[in-house]
UniProtKB/Swiss-Prot annotation:
GO biological process per UniProt: translation
Source species taxonomy: Archaea, Methanobacteriati, Methanobacteriota, Methanomada group, Methanobacteria
GO CC annotations, alphabetized: cytosolic small ribosomal subunit
Protein's recorded name: Small ribosomal subunit protein uS15
Record carries keyword Ribosomal protein: yes
Signal sequence annotation: none
A Pfam family: Ribosomal_S15
Sorted UniProt keywords: Ribonucleoprotein, Ribosomal protein
InterPro entries: Ribosomal_uS15, Ribosomal_uS15_arc_euk, Ribosomal_uS15_N, uS15_NS1_RNA-bd_sf
GO molecular function: small ribosomal subunit rRNA binding; structural constituent of ribosome
Family the UniProt entry places it in: Belongs to the universal ribosomal protein uS15 family.
Species name: Methanosphaera stadtmanae (strain ATCC 43021 / DSM 3091 / JCM 11832 / MCB-3)
Length: 133
């Protein structure tokens, strides 16, 4: 674990309160990390607090149903499918959709293997739009 940078003036308790406050304002974990880095001069929460932002939020009562990276990929796939409904001959975007859905399936396989997702969970493009909205 890296040492706490000397320019970080906030105490670990203040940083933790800030993380919870930013999450209650609707920011995702990656947005919280960017805000801490850019506006508060905290380069890495794991170096300062010894745990990740998601672990801090789970400890403070926030439970994530799905991992953020998986949800972001599903949102992209849903948006591309909507685009392809209007532009069915866009073959380059079809290729992009195939690649994104391949990433989704690989992530689902990884998360089911590590017990983050339930054993029988499958990605279904028809229900994906309901999942992200």
């Amino acid at each position: 674990m890296a040492a706490k940078p000397e320019w970080v003036e906030q105490s670990p308790e203040e940083i933790e309160e800030l993380i919870v406050k930013l999450h209650k304002e609707g920011q995702s974990t990656s947005q919280i990390g960017i805000t801490l880095r850019d506006q508060h001069g905290i380069p890495n929460t794991k170096a300062v607090l010894g745990e990740k932002i998601t672990d801090i939020l789970k400890r403070n009562g926030t439970d994530f149903e799905y991992p953020e990276d998986l949800l972001n990929l599903i949102k992209r796939a849903v948006n591309i499918r909507e685009h392809l409904e209007e532009n069915p001959k866009d073959i380059h975007t079809k290729r992009g959709l195939i690649k994104i859905e391949s990433k989704i399936r690989r992530l689902v396989k990884y998360y089911t293997r590590n017990n983050v997702l339930p054993e029988g969970w499958r990605y279904d493009p028809k229900t994906a739009a309901l999942l992200v909205k």
